[in-house]
């Protein structure tokens, strides 16, 4: 009888621990800031007609190095695109290289855009030398 009580006690403690861990993980993931992601998506929606506003939105993001990998790649792509559309010379390829490295050889619009702006950066670098 004592063995079954210990078993059920252990099972109850394990269940509570599992619930605690689940809630803790849920809390941690829900506390990540979505503000930057919303700004990225908003900047993307403005890019075609208002690239100057998109540039302002992108430059308002504090500490872009703290973004997730996906958001950092999108940030790099959009910031390069905004600079290009605002006729700001792309002096080096370090920013767009983040997007190129992330999107890699994926067959997507973002990968194509990253490679396009990477080429534009190389063109601007060749002209400036």
Regions inferred by a protein language model and the residue ranges of each:
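N-terminal secretory signal peptides that target proteins for export/translocation
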Residues: 1-15
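A "functional boundary" signal
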Residues: 7-8, 31-129
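Bacterial N-terminal signal peptides
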Residues: 18-28
């Amino acid at each position: 009888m004592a063995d079954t009580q210990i078993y059920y006690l252990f099972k109850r403690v394990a269940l509570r621990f599992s619930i605690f861990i689940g809630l803790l993980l849920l809390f941690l993931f829900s506390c990540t800031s979505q503000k930057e992601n919303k700004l990225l998506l908003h900047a993307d929606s403005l890019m075609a007609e208002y690239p100057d506003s998109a540039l302002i939105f992108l430059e308002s993001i504090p500490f872009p190095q703290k973004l997730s990998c996906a958001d950092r790649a999108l940030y790099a792509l959009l910031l390069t695109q905004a600079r290009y559309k605002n006729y700001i010379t792309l002096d080096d390829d370090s920013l767009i290289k983040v997007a190129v490295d992330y999107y890699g050889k994926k067959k997507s619009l973002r990968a194509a855009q990253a490679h396009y702006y990477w080429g534009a950066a190389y063109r601007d670098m060749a002209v400036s030398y």
